[in-house]
């Protein structure tokens, strides 16, 4: 089986300066309520928790998630030019879609979720993670690494320049490659190819049943971020 989907995303929500002047210090709480109400977040996750710290860019962070599964609403009430940020982590996005389908609307998709978020104001996708899963398709990370090393598979960047095998980070154990990293995480695009079955079996995950039932599972994850990688939404 080959499956394609959106794994997680980060959305930048721009400050409406006219509305900010009208509501002043209450503006961000107003937007937070709109965000929560639009997605029925309190019905699904409960009330958000204000974290006791910021992250260097935003000084106020609300988390609708739980444990290591996060859904953040971030803003900086001292630097308006930082705008606001909505972050759906992968596990939380899956849990949100599942709960929303059960409780609110069975037809919700990631695209419809993004369309609902676009009603909050001017928005831009600042990060989008795309996942392609090869389950029982016989796709091996170790085999792919060997083919890259032998130049049977050529890897190129956005400028179509060839990326040499030496610049592809290969990680594994027992003489077997289990993860490939292409480009840097800080770059506008980043590619990770890894043994998803092994990862799921090593930690708590909603994918545990799938991992236990399949023979092999390789995932390709593409991170797109920064200015030119992900465009403004026009939904």
Language-model segments: residues:
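Structured, helix-rich domain cores that form ligand/interaction pockets
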Residues: 1-235
């Amino acid at each position: 089986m080959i499956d394609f989907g959106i794994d997680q995303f980060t959305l930048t929500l721009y400050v409406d300066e006219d509305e900010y002047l009208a509501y002043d210090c209450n503006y961000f709480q107003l937007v937070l309520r709109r965000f929560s109400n639009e997605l029925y977040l309190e019905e699904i996750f409960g009330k958000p928790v204000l974290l006791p710290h910021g992250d260097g860019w935003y000084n106020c962070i609300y988390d609708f998630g739980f444990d290591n599964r996060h859904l953040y609403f971030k803003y900086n009430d001292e630097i308006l030019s930082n705008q606001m940020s909505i972050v759906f982590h992968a596990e939380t996005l899956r849990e949100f879609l599942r709960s929303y389908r059960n409780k609110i609307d069975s037809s919700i998709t990631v695209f419809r979720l993004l369309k609902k978020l676009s009603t909050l104001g001017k928005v831009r996708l600042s990060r989008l993670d795309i996942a392609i899963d090869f389950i029982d398709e016989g796709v091996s990370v170790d085999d792919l690494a060997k083919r890259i090393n032998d130049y049977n598979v050529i890897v190129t960047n956005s400028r179509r320049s060839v990326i040499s095998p030496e610049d592809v980070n290969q990680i594994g154990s027992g003489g077997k490659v289990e993860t490939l990293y292409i480009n840097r995480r800080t770059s506008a695009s980043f590619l990770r190819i890894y043994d998803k079955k092994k990862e799921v079996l090593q930690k708590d995950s909603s994918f545990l049943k799938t991992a236990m039932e399949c023979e092999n599972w390789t995932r390709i994850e593409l991170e797109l971020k920064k200015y030119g990688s992900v465009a403004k939404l026009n939904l």
